[in-house]
């Protein structure tokens, strides 16, 4: 009885320790980047709006380029790779959540046609596994396995993200067909400027909320500033600026409403593009091969017949 109670106590102690350790890791340590795909997953059922706009652009305001490479056509039930390219200058540093400077992270959302999904680990070729590395692919939701998100991951290592994709088999999945399908992709580098609740992150420009004169600037101990602006009617408005953005105003300066108080710290941005892929019918390829073979055979017989005819003509002329 005593031994059983001792085992239970040890298990409880172990569980409590793991819980506290996880809490410390998740909450206590400063984050180098916000987990931006989570924001979209929590707020939107589908990341692509009816207009074609990918919702990541709601938080990542700057526009940057992104590219995708996919095969022109694939056979059913085969594994192929889609490569998403998110280029940027790796020397750039962004403002982190704690106000310090650090490297940029990248993230991507890949919107595949219905039926296409991330390939199981046992179906991925070894050569492709070496390109993937330690990437983790997450379905956008349990209902949308054809929509995949990756990130945030270090941009210095992953300016190209390889997705191992398994194509569907229309013979088994009646919801898919041999057809040309669009593939949509969104990719960003760096943190966002807006949170889902509409508030600004510290990776954004801060503007004056009113017209007036800056009568005092106070630096906060942990970074950031408090600006007191005196309005024309004598009221004092307090502007709070978090750690990270750099001030471009000074005490005694007059400002107008919506005038920038800080530089724009953002060096990243979001981009989206699309590609096309054909789910090819093997029977069509076999028919095409058979057609080419028949043409070659017909051409061969035609040449042989022509030579035979020429020999007959030559024999008649000699006779």
Swiss-Prot record:
N-terminal signal peptide: 1-35
GO molecular function: electron transfer activity; heme binding; iron ion binding
Main localisation: plastid
Reported cofactor(s): heme
Cofactor: record remark: Binds 1 heme group covalently.
TM helices/strands, residue ranges: 285-305
Binding-site positions, heme: 36, 56, 59-60
One GO term of the biological process aspect: photosynthesis
Keyword tRNA processing among UniProt keywords: no
Compartments (UniProt record): Plastid, Chloroplast thylakoid membrane
Subunit relationships: The 4 large subunits of the cytochrome b6-f complex are cytochrome b6, subunit IV (17 kDa polypeptide, petD), cytochrome f and the Rieske protein, while the 4 small subunits are PetG, PetL, PetM and PetN. The complex functions as a dimer.
Listed name of the protein: Cytochrome f
Organism: Chlorokybus atmophyticus (Soil alga)
């Amino acid at each position: 009885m005593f031994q059983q109670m001792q085992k239970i106590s040890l298990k409880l102690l172990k569980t409590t320790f793991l819980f506290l350790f996880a809490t410390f890791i998740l909450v206590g340590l400063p984050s180098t980047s916000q987990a931006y795909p989570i924001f979209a997953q929590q707020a939107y059922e589908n990341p692509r709006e009816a207009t074609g706009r990918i919702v990541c652009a709601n938080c990542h305001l700057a526009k940057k380029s992104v590219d995708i490479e996919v095969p022109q056509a694939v056979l059913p039930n085969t594994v192929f790779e889609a490569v998403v390219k998110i280029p940027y200058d790796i020397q750039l540093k962004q403002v982190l959540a704690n106000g310090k400077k650090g490297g940029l992270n990248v993230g991507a959302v890949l919107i595949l046609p219905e039926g296409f999904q991330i390939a199981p680990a046992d179906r991925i070729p070894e050569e492709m596994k070496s390109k993937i590395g330690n990437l983790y692919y997450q379905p956008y939701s349990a209902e949308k396995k054809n929509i995949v998100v990756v990130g945030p991951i270090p941009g210095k290592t992953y300016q190209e993200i390889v997705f191992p994709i398994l194509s569907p088999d229309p013979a088994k999945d009646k919801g898919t067909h041999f057809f040309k399908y669009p593939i949509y992709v969104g990719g960003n580098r760096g943190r966002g400027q807006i949170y889902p609740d509409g508030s600004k992150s510290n990776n954004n420009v801060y503007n004056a909320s009113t017209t007036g004169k800056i009568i005092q600037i106070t630096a906060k101990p942990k970074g950031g500033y408090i600006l007191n602006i005196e309005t024309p009617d004598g009221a004092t408005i307090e502007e709070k600026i978090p750690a990270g953005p750099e001030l471009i105003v000074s005490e005694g300066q007059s400002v107008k409403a919506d005038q920038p108080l800080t530089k724009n710290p953002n060096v990243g941005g979001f981009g989206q593009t699309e590609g096309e892929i054909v789910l090819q019918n093997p029977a069509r390829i076999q028919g095409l091969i058979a057609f080419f073979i028949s043409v070659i055979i017909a051409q061969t017989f035609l040449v042989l017949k022509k030579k035979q005819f020429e020999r007959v003509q030559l024999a008649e002329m000699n006779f």
